[in-house]
Amino acid sequence: MADQEVLVLRGTLEGHNGWVTSLATTPAHPDLLLSGSRDKTLIKWKLTGGEDNQYGIPKKSFKGHSHIVQDVTISADGAYALSASWDRTLRLWDLETGETTQRFVGHKGDVLSVSIAKNLRQIVSASRDKTVKVWNTIGECMATLTGHNDWVSAVRISPSDQSSTVISASWDKTVKSWDLADYSVNADFIGHTGYISCITLSPDGSLCASAGKDGVIILWDLNKNKTLYTLEAKAEVHALAFSPNRYWLAAATTSGIKIFKLQERSLLDELKPEFAVGATAKDPEAISLAWSADGQNLFAGYTDNVIRVWQVMTPSA
């Protein structure tokens, strides 16, 4: 029975000295995980799959940013990484060597999010300066998209080959869809009652999920530019990730990670590690998520600087 699947905590990856703010994987390198942190670095991990109780080993630390790294992503060909930082810049890195190959300078505030087109031609970034910027790969700003009236917390380019859509989310409580061809607004998605901190696009680019302060996840149909339905996370949401091969959505909330089954619009599982009980300490929270390319593992970055690895299992009846 496929519906009996649950997620089991399999291991941890330790190497960062600050909150793990972002995670990225790529089908081009199934044994690779990239993480970004408040410690100003990125770490490239080689995933070992649990041999010797180790789920992965840090292979390289990418240094160069002078402030918190807020977001990381990997190019579709698996050759490059991109990072967004509170130092107001983006960096393009050679994923193999860990060297910076390009800096992107122009934002007037912390850069909070970055995304690269599948064809590798365009890069978009979102900032506390309330703008989305569109760049080419040699670091030239091609356009500045204005329209949000508060911090732009997240931006994603559609993964679909046929699409030139960019989705952005803001603390102004709106999600916007932009056309990269002429930099116009396709649609404004209204519905959140608090700031939005994260968005994720489905693997085929047809769906967007957004969430944040109000504890409600809204699913949007990007083909028809309309609201589909909502899911109740019942807690502030820090991160979202669609499974690459199941109709699931993972949400990192202040009260644990929730896995929703989208077909049934129901909660499949809730992931809460056992933390040592502290007198005053809050439990660490998951603030970043990424599924492995095969959908069998969920990686979560936490505020105790640790990455936890959950595996999809079918309990033997």
Curated annotation (Swiss-Prot):
SUPFAM superfamilies from the UniProt entry: WD40 repeat-like
Description of the deletion phenotype: Causes defects in hyphal development under hypha-inducing conditions and attenuates virulence in a mouse model of systemic infection.
Gene Ontology molecular function: any one: signaling receptor activator activity
Keywords: Cytoplasm, Repeat, Ribonucleoprotein, Ribosomal protein, WD repeat
Alphabetized Gene3D superfamilies for the sequence: YVTN repeat-like/Quinoprotein amine dehydrogenase
First and last residues of every WD repeat: 15-55, 64-103, 106-146, 148-188, 191-230, 232-272, 281-317
Xref: SMART domains: WD40
GO terms of biological process kind: cell adhesion; cellular response to neutral pH; cellular response to starvation; filamentous growth; filamentous growth of a population of unicellular organisms in response to biotic stimulus; filamentous growth of a population of unicellular organisms in response to neutral pH; filamentous growth of a population of unicellular organisms in response to starvation; G protein-coupled receptor signaling pathway
The keyword Acetylation appears for this protein: no
The keyword Membrane appears for this protein: no
Subcellular location: Cytoplasm
Pfam families xref list: WD40
Cellular component, GO annotation: cytosol; cytosolic small ribosomal subunit; extracellular vesicle; nucleus
Function of the molecule: Component of the ribosome, a large ribonucleoprotein complex responsible for the synthesis of proteins in the cell. The small ribosomal subunit (SSU) binds messenger RNAs (mRNAs) and translates the encoded message by selecting cognate aminoacyl-transfer RNA (tRNA) molecules. The large subunit (LSU) contains the ribosomal catalytic site termed the peptidyl transferase center (PTC), which catalyzes the formation of peptide bonds, thereby polymerizing the amino acids delivered by tRNAs into a polypeptide chain.
Subunit: Component of the small ribosomal subunit. Mature ribosomes consist of a small (40S) and a large (60S) subunit. The 40S subunit contains about 32 different proteins and 1 molecule of RNA (18S). The 60S subunit contains 45 different proteins and 3 molecules of RNA (25S, 5.8S and 5S).
Protein family membership: Belongs to the WD repeat G protein beta family. Ribosomal protein RACK1 subfamily.
Any further remark recorded for this protein: Has antigenic properties. Elicits a specific immune response in systemic candidiasis human patients undergoing malignant hematological disorders.
Listed name of the protein: Small ribosomal subunit protein RACK1
Organism: Candida albicans (strain SC5314 / ATCC MYA-2876) (Yeast)
